[in-house]
């Protein structure tokens, strides 16, 4: 159903206790949220808006269906001794 898939890589900011967009193939995408689920809610709003604004930078014919591939990474450090 989805014509085009956008990849968004989210990372955990331990100090701020937030997930944030670390990288994406969508020009201008920036967002943060306390959970990946909350981040996805924001992305569902932001991505269509940015696709419309940046249509001249995205060289594909996009239909009404967009797919979001959200990859998250969280690295924890701990004292083991």
What are these regions (language model features)?
Residues 1-9, 15, 37-81:
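Short, charged, surface-exposed hinge/linker loops at domain edges
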């Amino acid at each position: 159903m989805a014509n085009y898939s956008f990849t968004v890589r989210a990372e955990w900011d331990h100090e701020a206790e937030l997930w944030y967009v670390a990288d994406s193939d969508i020009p201008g995408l920036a967002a943060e949220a306390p959970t990946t689920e909350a981040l996805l809610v924001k992305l569902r709003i932001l991505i269509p808006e940015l696709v419309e604004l940046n249509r001249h930078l995205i060289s594909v014919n996009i239909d009404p269906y967009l797919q979001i591939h959200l990859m998250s990474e969280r690295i924890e450090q701990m004292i083991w001794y």
